Amino acid sequence: MTRSLKKNPFVANRLLRKIDNLNTKAEKEIIITWSRASTIIPTMIGHTIAIHNGKEHLPIYITDRMVGHKLGEFAPTLNFRGHAKSDNRSRR
């Protein structure tokens, strides 16, 4: 179910404050965040945001095509290593 259009997109206040401060200073630095549920808004374009995947922070460069998506979509949490191999040979 999508978010109501009457509401604004969710962005964590702390993350929004950090981005606004960097935009007023015209600086670029990596912003570390745990807020995977935050929506990418146009003021974030051009910044690098390190998104937590449960183990480490993955730096993601925000482009204009990412606007409207959530930060968590770009930091995968699961690492599938393949199904276990069958050990039928060793059992014989």
Swiss-Prot record:
Main subcellular location: plastid
Q: Which GO terms describe its molecular function?
A: rRNA binding; structural constituent of ribosome
Gene3D superfamilies tied to this protein: 30s Ribosomal Protein S19, Chain A
Q: Which UniProt keywords apply?
A: Chloroplast, Plastid, Ribonucleoprotein, Ribosomal protein, RNA-binding, rRNA-binding
Per the record, its GO cellular-component terms are: chloroplast; mitochondrial small ribosomal subunit
Q: Tell me, what is an example of a GO biological process annotation in this record? A: translation
Q: Where in the cell is it found?
A: Plastid, Chloroplast
State whether keyword Plastid applies: yes
Classification via Pfam families: Ribosomal_S19
Keyword Chloroplast among UniProt keywords:
yes
Q: Indicate the family of this protein.
A: Belongs to the universal ribosomal protein uS19 family.
Q: Which PANTHER family match?
A: RIBOSOMAL PROTEIN S19P FAMILY MEMBER, SMALL RIBOSOMAL SUBUNIT PROTEIN US19M
Q: Tell me, what does this protein do in biology? A: Protein S19 forms a complex with S13 that binds strongly to the 16S ribosomal RNA.
- Would you tell me the protein name for this molecule? Small ribosomal subunit protein uS19c
State the organism named in the record: Daucus carota (Wild carrot)
